[in-house]
Amino acid sequence: MFAVVKASGFQRLVEVGSVISIDPTNVDSGGFVHFPVLLLVDGAEVVSDPDKLRLARVSAKFLRKLRGPKVRIHKFKNKTGYHKRQGHRQGVYVFSVTSIERGD
């Protein structure tokens, strides 16, 4: 069974056991979160009806916090000698999908 969920403003294709990385949310260590389901695929059956999807539920367990790759920003202005370097690393939370329930 597959599901498309909305997580941190992005759509992710998940199945039970898959690991996803998203932007930080409010969750405790070892806690569970539930993602809204946008599409559900169970074998040959595809569920896209919003009324049925409100009952569906995808649960994921929080695994760990990570930091993403370093992004380097360099501002430069010609002929003035002005330049500025700056770096940024975005925080990332890693979740493992534990269950996908249809809610029928």
UniProtKB/Swiss-Prot annotation:
An example GO biological process term is: translation
The free-text function statement in the UniProt record for this protein reads: This protein binds to 23S rRNA in the presence of protein L20.
On whether Chaperone is a keyword of this UniProt record, the answer is no
- Its name, as the record gives it, is Large ribosomal subunit protein bL21
Query: Which keywords annotate this record?
Result: Ribonucleoprotein, Ribosomal protein, RNA-binding, rRNA-binding
One short Pfam name that applies is Ribosomal_L21p
From which source organism is this entry? Tropheryma whipplei (strain Twist) (Whipple's bacillus)
Q: Which family does it belong to?
A: Belongs to the bacterial ribosomal protein bL21 family.
Which InterPro entries does the record associate with it? bL21-like (IPR028909), bL21-like_sf (IPR036164), Ribosomal_bL21 (IPR001787)
KW Oxidoreductase (keyword) present = no
